[in-house]
Each structure stands twice: as structure tokens, then as C-alpha cells.
Amino acid sequence: MMLCRLLEDLDCTLVQGRSDIEVNAICCDSRSVTPGCVFVCLPGQHTDGRRFAHAAAAAGAAVLVFEGTLPNFEFSRSCSPALVQAEPGKARRVLALMASRLYGYPARRMTMIGITGTKGKTTTAHLLAAVLTAAGRRVGCIGTNGAVWPGQRHTLGYTTPESCELQHILRDMADDGCDACVMEVSSLGLKMDRVGGIEFDVGVFTNLSPDHIGPGEHASYAEYRAWKSVLFRRCKVGVVNADDRETPAILKGHSCRVVRYGIAAPADWLALPGFTPRRTADALATDFTVRLPGGRMADFTVPMPGAFSVQDALAALAAAGVLGVPVAAMQAGLRGAAVRGRCEVVPCPAPFTVVLDYAHNAAAAESVLTALRAYHPGRLITVFGCGGGRSRLRRTGMGEACARLADLCIVTEDNSRGEPLEDIFADIRTGMDRVQNGAACVEISNRRDALLYALGLGREGDILAVLGKGHETTIDRDGRKVPFEDAAVVREYMERVK
């Protein structure tokens, strides 16, 4: 595409170079620069993208986009990219709109569903994708578990990728025949304009509780909530949780039609009281009945435990209903859905059940462990840790929740990011000590050793809940990511004791 076409009506100005040059890609990471691409220098908390302008130009970038100035920037005859100055604070917006235009507005070629909230985004996204697939749609899914569509799976660095990566993925999905995309839209994804230029057909709100508050994230809970609410000014229909107390704030200033789902509050999609937990060899399922819009009743099964899974399923069903999916397809899709690392039961010949879940804060841990209690385990054993370089309140909260709800806690590492484990463990113990007559605790620094120890304790009827990493395939030790997967350790143990 010609640069002049790419720059039309954007908040930026060509300050040096020609506008009639061809560009073929766009990126914001200098390591991804290819000859003929646009490199956008993004301002950041720890570094400034302008520092990498020389490297990008040397690698063949045809255009550099930046805010402010490029200090001490000199070109050689063989390295003289066009320079585009973005208006102050607009570089991210310019990146998003450029990427959307360059890749042919791929979001317009698909039905776009965006899901936001503190908990349940990944589960809701994958349940909805399964339901839409059962209805005959070809569906892509973007979020914490990566970018996935039929025959393709790609890992991502963020729940909501940077806009240049996101638009490239959307183009690949659309070119591969996808007619729907379900994606997780994080608060930072909205704040950093990663979804700029996308109008969602459906926006979904799951729930809200304090999280992602601190340096590099959000300055306050109010700011966190405000950015979540932006989605409902960028979608045609908003599907919201009638039971969540923050829903009115999320809908403040909304411009969409609203559909509500819930368990307790009046809702268009209402789950009736009396969920039935079912425990089988390969699943902890929940049966429930929904009163649909218009008053009809329908029975559903979600292959996951707990009221929170019913709530996530309701969100998916309500969104599917907005899109005209028949009830029979909803039932079949939901029943056969699987979500990696979200209350995932690892198939094993042992007489106890192993559940993997991504829960990494107090609210999520409490939801999971409360749900597992409904299956009346002999003992509920949990293995968990907390990440380094994150809020200490998350650690004390996790410790308190696990001590209150489990019979035995095995505390271990979880992405320490260079912070001493003894400091992390001390914060977890502080939370556990708040609980009178709480669970017994064992500390084992190495996560593999901790898992093997817990598996060795398992008896008939027990449930072993492994929390924190879920789908992840690496662990961060001292700032270095090394291969590690909870499920692989479980499978290794089961092979050994067969």
C-alpha cells in the first residue's frame, strides 16, 4: 500500500521523505522489522521506542512513526526512511488504524465478539467458540490461550496482542475462511488502543474485582473499571452480567443494546436454582436449566464445576443467542467444550482427580476451590504459588483463600521473575495465618517436586487442585523462561505408577 493512502485522515504528519513509497507490513518491535515495513516507536513505561529507531532503519524499515522528535538521528544514503510524526499521545492510535487499513480491515470480514472482565474471559471465549462451531461457523479465538482457529495455534505475548500483531492475525483468520472471531479484550488492551479501529458486533462483560492495579497497569480500581467500560461504547450489543454489582458502572455511557444474563438477578438469560454437579472419570460437569428470552426452558451441561462455570456458560449462551444460534447447537457445543487450563481435569488412571486451573488471585482461587468442594472430595489438596514482581496483596489473598478452603496446601514457585521465593512465601504465609484452624501447609520450592509430592499423597476420592499456571508451558525463574507444564508432570507421574 502507498504511504500516502496509509496516512489518510490519521493524527500524524509526514515530516520527511516521500509519500508515494510502498509499504508491506507494520510493527512496533524492532526485532520484527522487515525491509519495506513501517516501524512505530511506541512510548512505554520502561523504555521508549525511539531508542530503537536506528536499529529499525538499519533493518530496512521504510517508514518510522514517532511522537515528539528523534534526537540525534542521522541517516546514511543507504538508510533514509520516511519520517512520520504522530500527534502527542496518538502513536498507539495511529498504529492501530494503520494496521487495520494495511491488512484490509479484516475485522469487517468476520463477526467480532469481544469479552472483558476480571475473571472468566478465557473460559467464556472458548465456550462461545465451541457453541458457534457447533452451529456451523468457522471460528477463531484470541486470548490468554493464544490465537487458535481450525488447524492453527499460535502463542501470544499478551491476552490482547499489540494492534499490529492483532490485525495480522485477524487477516490470517479471515483469509483462512473464519467468519467469526471471539477474543478476550483486556483493560490494558483497551487502554493501549490494541483494539483501535475494531467495532465489535457483541461485547461481553463477565465480572469485575480489583486486579491489574499497580505500576505499568492501572493507577486505581476506578481507572481499571473505566477502561473495561470502553468496550460498551464500541459494540452493537452488550451482553452483561446482571449479578455483578459493577455492571451499572460498566454500562455508564454505553451506546449499545443491552442483553442481561444471570443466576440471581432478573435477566434475559436466567439460570434456575439447583445446579447438579456430576463427577466422572474425565470431567467435573455441571447440569443446569436456563429460562430463555420469551420464557422457554432449556437444559444444559457445562463440562466444568461450579456456579462460576454456569455464569461463564450463560455469558456464552446469551452472546450466541444474540447471534441467532439455535438452542440445539448451544446444547451440543457447550456439552463438548474444552478449555485448556481452566478447571481442566487431567485424564489419569488414579482413583483421585487432578484439576488444573489458571487461578492466580484470591477471588479466582476461592471460586475454584468452592466449586470443587461441591463434589465432596475425600480431601481437597491444592498446589499453588504466586508470581514475583506483582502485588503482595495477591499473595496474602491467595494464601488466605487456600488455607480456608483446602485441607492441605503445598506452596511452591509460580513465575518468580527474579524475586526471592522466601519473600513470596512469607507473604503467602501471612495470608494463611489469618485463618484459624486453616489447612496444613508444606513449602516446596521446585514446582515439579511439589507436584510429584502432592500426587504421591493422593488417595481414592481426593481432588488435587493445581492452581496458577493452567495452560502455560513455561515458568519464569530469575527472569528467564524455561519449559514447564503442569499437565506434563502429571502425565509423567501417571506413566510411572501405572
Descriptions of predicted regions:
Residues 9, 57, 71-76, 175-176, ...:
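Acidic, Mg2+-coordinating active-site environments of NTP-dependent enzymes
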Residues 1-97, 270, 279-281, 297, ...:
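N-terminal leader/targeting and accessory segments in enzymes
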Residues 49-61, 82-89, 200-206, 224-226, ...:
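A short, gly/pro- and small-residue-rich
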Residues 25-28, 60-67, 182-183, 237-241, ...:
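Short, hydrophobic beta-strand segments that form beta-sheet elements in well-ordered domains
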Residues 66-69, 185, 207, 242, ...:
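Short secondary-structure boundary segments
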Residues 1-14, 32-38, 48-51, 255, ...:
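ATP-dependent carboxylate-amine ligase
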Residues 10, 92-242, 246-257, 314, ...:
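Phosphate-binding loop of NTP-binding sites
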Residues 38, 63, 202, 237, ...:
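Well-ordered beta-strand positions
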